Amino acid sequence: MTEEFNESMINDIKEGDKVTGEVQEIEEKQVIVAVNGAKFNGIIPISQLSTHHIDNPSDAVKVGDEIGAYVTKVEYDEENETGAYILSKRQLETEKSYEFLQEQLDNNQTIEAKVTEVVKGGLVVDVGQRGFVPASLISTDFIEDFSDFEGQVLKLKVEELDPANNRVILSRKAVEALENAEKKDELLESLNEGDVIEGKVARLTNFGAFVDIGGVDGLVHVSELSHEHVKSPEDVVSIGETVNVKIKSVDKDSERISLSIKDTLPSPFESIKGEFNEGDVIEGTVVRLANFGAFVEIKPGVQGLVHISEISHSHIGSPSEALEPGQVVSVKVLGVDVENERISLSIKATLPNENVIESDSETTQSYLDNGSDDEDNPTLGDVFGDKLKDFKF
């Protein structure tokens, strides 16, 4: 009979089998389970009750719970015809966890997990077993102190699974990047030219300032920072500063947004009505050269154009032949259009024309008064003499 009993025992449940049963008794360091369809009870040591660290078996199970476990060892006492199955609930939980995580990895799904511990290299999380989020995969932004994450439930993506080495690597950064991309798409759709919105200066370059307007950076070109001439963006704004910006253009395909701070500020032209009039001669500073002329600042934020034809009495091919940025010049006001913020200026009109022939005013007037029919009256040759000799007609 003992032989028959042994054989049935061995053939009944073997090491590696998956079994189910009801928790019958909870002891200090183990749990007794009535294994379904088996001749002996199962024993689960406290170390095999959970994938998490527990101090008491009752932290993992309660009497009457129906649980599953793997058989890790079959113990049988032939002499007393008694036996027991050593079980691992932890092994089964780990297997199920890997199956779930592999499915999420294959389908690029997002999961949620609670941070159980903050360590030097990152975050330990509960994903049915121990998972790890390295510091480099915690956020798209730099974070110096991770302590605030302890106890938080995070959205994560599975980056790497290695069951053989009990290695589960997850990323919060990947989730953030995806969320940021979605927010960017939504924001780009909502932006309209002419809108005035609030943003924060994110970084400065020599050609302008990038402003964060809600997860997307737009560029304020250096020429759009102020009504006044700006040499360097850092002279006007600083990183972290909150500013109002006007949307000048949005290219949704290239995700480029052009912004202006200048357009949100009062125009200095509003304060010059009656200050500058046609014919006035004033001083200004050359701030910019173009192929068609030079822009001269005559008051902070107020620039006028000296057309290339108004720079010199002599022919010039380029404004740079006569002028350079920073040069102080005298200009004559040719016209003022405050409504359209345009001022026409002339440098030429303030300069003597060396090509104009100087004449004796009295002699010339005499010629004009008396005419040239009388032979006693002077001719043009008499008036100008040798002055006409070198002049080309």
From Swiss-Prot:
Chain's role: Binds mRNA; thus facilitating recognition of the initiation point. It is needed to translate mRNA with a short Shine-Dalgarno (SD) purine-rich sequence.
UniProt keyword Ribosomal protein present: yes
Record's keyword annotation contains Repeat: yes
One GO-annotated biological process of the protein: translation
Single GO molecular function: mRNA binding
Domain S1 motif: 16-90, 108-173, 194-262, 279-348
SUPFAM superfamilies recorded: Nucleic acid-binding proteins (SSF50249)
Transmembrane segments: none
SMART domains membership: S1
Protein name per its UniProtKB record: Small ribosomal subunit protein bS1
A GO cellular-component term linked to this record: ribonucleoprotein complex
Biased amino acid composition, Polar residues: 356-369
Keyword entries, A-Z: Repeat, Ribonucleoprotein, Ribosomal protein, RNA-binding
Stretches for region Disordered: 356-381
Family label: Belongs to the bacterial ribosomal protein bS1 family.
